[in-house]
Each structure stands twice: as structure tokens, then as C-alpha cells.
Amino acid sequence: MRRGLISRSKAELPDAVLDARLARVRAAMDAAGLDALLLYTNNTRAAGVSWLTGFVPYWSEALLVVPRDREPVLVAALSYRVKSWIERTSRLAEVIHGPRIGFEAASMIAARKADAAIGIADLDGLAAGIVEDLRRGGPRLSLSDATALFAPLRAEADPAEIALAMRAAAIAQHALAQTPGRGASLGESIAAIEAQARTDGAEEVYVAAAPDLDRDRRLRRIEGEAALGESFALRATVAYKGTWIRLTRTFPRDGAVQPQEAAAARLAAAVAKLPSSDGFAGFSSWLVEGCRIAQPLAPLMGSRVATAHPLAPSALVSVQADFEIEGRPLLLGAPALVGRRGEAASLLVPPF
């Protein structure tokens, strides 16, 4: 469940931006012969619907119906009492409420065209019960998987999304800078990071830690207290207006000087070669995450990713890498923008 501020800013996400995104989607729908596109959303898979409407659910689930010739309609399992909140925080032609979102969406579409051609982004990931309700609500509707249609459109970041990612990254930088330093417990550091991120307007923030990099470099959620090693890593995952980024830093327990400049330069050099993985040769491990359809930070490629997904030009991603400098373990990460063809990729902000 979302615990931070969910609001809409027309200065940061103007109607013209949503209009341009919808126009691109509708052009692809027209070429594919689709009458409508369906996108599923919940509090963990919000990045498809929020990209087209600004809507981010704090809980529950919904289906966005994007007709080829009309404005989008949201069919939400949330109760009617939050209707005005949904309308304030998003741009939608209509909000329909009902517990069976598949049935309601299909009935609405079938009422206008009984044999409409419907594309569903990430059909394989849609719950079987919702698919069954779609078929019950519109027995003559033609349902097909529209993942290949939607994914390339969603992957390419426009200037508005890049600006939101920069804002999220600035929140993460400021939050990580609040780590108390020598003598502070891990719990105190995490609390300070969360408090600052929420004060700065984060929609959501999650903090993960690797308490002792000499023993284990895996990041995890900390329950209770954990003893700190000579160096430890903290990762802030921040959401702002539907855009998610990760920022990871390594900290010395005793406040000793770290090779920050050399470490940041090595990460930036590896990122510059994306979408090729060549820059990460020699790293202990690495990971690139980003949005394909609805999950905001899905694993796209990395040393432990079995099936890699090609990075689209102008894609926003978050990169994390594990390596050593002068014998010291370092875990670093930052958001990045993949270049267009022939251009180098670049970090949006440095990790330190």
C-alpha cells in the first residue's frame, strides 16, 4: 500500500504530454486494427496506466480501457468513495467502480461494438479470473496479446518522464545524504533516509541495505537491527509522480575516505556502453532495471538475469553494480538514460 503523497501536477505532467503519449498508442492501435487497448494496474504494477493518465493506485486494482476513438476510461475495484480523489490525481474521461473489473470493462466495450478487437498489454500476466470475466462480459470480443505493441512505446522516455526521474533522483540523493555517519546504527540511518524522502515529496520510498559488504553484498530489507561491517551499502528506491528510480551508495562505518570519484567514473564508463553489456566486464555482478509494461523496475539485463530484454533507445533505467577498487568492495547504483542509436548512455545523477 502506498504511504506517501499521491498528487497530480499539471506543471510537471501537462495534458499535452498525455495527449502525445495517447496519440502514439492510438496510431499503433490503428495500424494493428485494434478497437481498444486494456492495461492492468495495481500498487506494484502501476507504470503503464500512470504513463497514460497519471493515475497511481494506493491499493487495489483497475483496468484502463483506451478506445481508439475516445478518451480513456478507468474501471476500478476501489470503492465509489474515492472517485473524487481518482479524478483529482489523474486525467480520465470516466471512472467506473465495480469488484469485477474484467466484466465491467468488457460489458462497456461490447455495448458499443459487440465484436470489438481488444488488445491486452501483458495478457500472460493478467489474472485468469479477470480474463474469464472479460470473456463473460463480452462473449464476442476478440482478445489478443498487445505486449509487442505497447512495450516499445512505453520503454522510450519523453522529456516529461526524464524530468520526473531527475526529481526522484534528487530526492534520493538528498535522502541518502542524511545518513548520520560514524556511530549511528543501521536503523537510524534508514529512518533518516525515509523521513527525508517523504519530506521532499516522495510518493514512495523503500530502503534496502547490505550491512557488511565483506560478508554479503546482497541488498535486503532490514527487519530489526543488523551489525555494520567496515563498509555497508544503502539503496533508496524512490517513486515520484509515477516515476521510479534507484540510487545505491557504499558507506564506511568509521567515516574513512572512499575512492568516490574513481568508483563513480567506473560506473559511468560501464553505463556509457549500454545497451551493450561490454562495459560491465570485470564487475562482480551488475543489474539493469526499467519499465517494459507496468512493473516500474523490472530486471532487463544483468549478470544474473537469465533472459535479457533489449534496452530501447531513450529508455530510463536504474543500474546497480558490484566491484572493487583498491581492494575495497563497492556497491553503487544510479538512474541512467540510454542513448539513441549512435549515442552513449549516461547517468542522470552521480551515485555520490
What are these language model-derived features?
Residues M1-F352:
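Active-site neighborhoods and metal-handling regions in enzymes and metal-associated proteins
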